[in-house]
Amino acid sequence: MALHNLQPAPGSTHKTKRVGRGQGSGMGKTATRGQKGQKSRTGYSQKRGFEGGQQPLQRRLPKIGFTSNVVKPHAINVDKVKKVAQLEEITMETIRSVYKLPKYVTRVKLIGSSVQEIVSKIKDDNISYSGQK
């Protein structure tokens, strides 16, 4: 076996039928297009998705999808997580040390009724709090 004598298995390939090459071929004259009409003319092609006047699938289905790229802050209730309120300086690192945050969380919002008491301790721009103006 060598590259120069490789050939497909017998019967696996067929010669393509050449249409419009004389009446003796059985596919001459109209070349399998039938008589007259738009589909028999040269240059004819339907646009993609055309279903013969029926409402196309892409118009029948509802429009979906929009995902905001704005990263929403992870909310931490200070009343429930007392350790956050006891920190001397509140930064992302100190919050991570006392509260288990997922790695993807980059912004935090402190909520709860006792937030106003610890506002002066916040030293990070990525930390906001409820009632902020």
From Swiss-Prot:
Part of the 50S ribosomal subunit. One of its GO terms (molecular function) is structural constituent of ribosome. The keyword rRNA-binding applies. It comes from the Bacteria. Belongs to the universal ribosomal protein uL15 family. InterPro entries: Ribosomal_uL15, Ribosomal_uL15/eL18_sf, Ribosomal_uL15_bac-type. GO terms for biological process: translation. This is Large ribosomal subunit protein uL15. Residues 32-45 have a biased composition (Polar residues). Keywords: Ribonucleoprotein, Ribosomal protein, RNA-binding, rRNA-binding. It comes from Nitratiruptor sp. (strain SB155-2). Residues 1-62 are annotated as: Disordered. Binds to the 23S rRNA. GO terms for cellular component: cytosolic large ribosomal subunit.
